[in-house]
Amino acid sequence: MLSLNLSLKPQHLKLLSCYTDSSAPSIAKKLIKESKLSRDFSQKIQIVDYAPLVQTLSQRRLPDVAHEIFLQTKSVNLLPNYRTLCALMLCFAENGFVLRARTIWDEIINSCFVPDVFVVSKLISAYEQFGCFDEVAKITKDVAARHSKLLPVVSSLAISCFGKNGQLELMEGVIEEMDSKGVLLEAETANVIVRYYSFFGSLDKMEKAYGRVKKFGIVIEEEEIRAVVLAYLKQRKFYRLREFLSDVGLGRRNLGNMLWNSVLLSYAADFKMKSLQREFIGMLDAGFSPDLTTFNIRALAFSRMALFWDLHLTLEHMRRLNIVPDLVTFGCVVDAYMDKRLARNLEFVYNRMNLDDSPLVLTDPLAFEVLGKGDFHLSSEAVLEFSPRKNWTYRKLIGVYLKKKLRRDQIFWNY
């Protein structure tokens, strides 16, 4: 097997710097002429390796020159080896020459060569960059037909490519291809399918994907559970959310309080206060210790319903468990009192809180999906963003907020 000179000399780099669309054939001819291959043209077919040269041309965005070298060497019976074919295919795909890349792929898949998974992965990434999802689907079908042993890995790559780009029909096509070949989904792939359906699909399709996970005895992971919970919350399907959480199993301690907090959130969003209290007690009875998010979900509901006594009990419970309030907790207190024009009574409450701490938001963002952020919370975030260098405390933020509210009321009454 012959090999082109693997390094580009300074004169070659100068030559490439003068590249224009019409100069590709002449540049290719000069590169070939100054390589070892120029002395080996014969009638006999020979296999050659010039992958490093192609890779350099690809990096310099010169796929036309690489293509000309490919054509000119092939015309004199110098055929590229597998490594060079892969380099050419990636060079074309990464530079947007899809038809050329497909031609090389067809040559590889219909030969005795077995595609390399790493190369297939890079090819799929290149097609994804240009939105050529049909080409990715073709790769999967070709692998299924010719090299079925590679199908599990290639299918996982394709599913990930389609899923993250919302190409759910193509993703489902890959799953059906796997089913027809009797290839089982790996746990990680099955989980990602659930996640992508929760991002881009309907609830019915998401539930079907979750059913597939259950059918094969695969444990659904935390990231996927969060994605499913978020999908239910966005569409306010709280009953279906609770059914899902119950099915997953509220006793899964490796997930912390996420499952229980999601149950509480589903009741808080509907302001079903008795059910909220019942599930909170159920959480304690199950041996789970409430965290900041647990208390803030309850506090948000109590604040909106102006249930001051329940709000005070929540703060007392937090103190007993040494759970430090965050900006959300302060917002619940401030908003509840301000909404009822009880600003004078605020001092009685917040003097027992961590007023001189730096403001932080440590609550799970899922809580804001249905309960939103209160007026004090939003106002404080705007203040912190506008002047981040100041040493803000909760006390200062409350002072700024009360002044703003007072000014707003004065303007209102002046008109």
Swiss-Prot record:
UniProt lists the family membership as follows: Belongs to the PPR family. P subfamily.
The cross-references to InterPro entries, in alphabetical order and at most eight, read: Pentatricopeptide_rpt, TPR-like_helical_dom_sf
Which Pfam families does the entry mention?
A: PPR
Question: PANTHER family, from UniProt?
Answer: OS08G0520200 PROTEIN (PTHR47493:SF1)
Task: For this UniProt record, give its keywords in alphabetical order, as a comma-separated list.
Answer: Repeat
Query: What NCBIfam families does this protein map onto?
Result: PPR
Q: Where are the PPR repeats?
A: 46-80, 81-115, 116-150, 151-185, 186-220, 221-255, 256-290, 291-325, 326-360
Q: What is this protein called?
A: Pentatricopeptide repeat-containing protein At3g42630
Does 4Fe-4S show up as a keyword for this record?
A: no
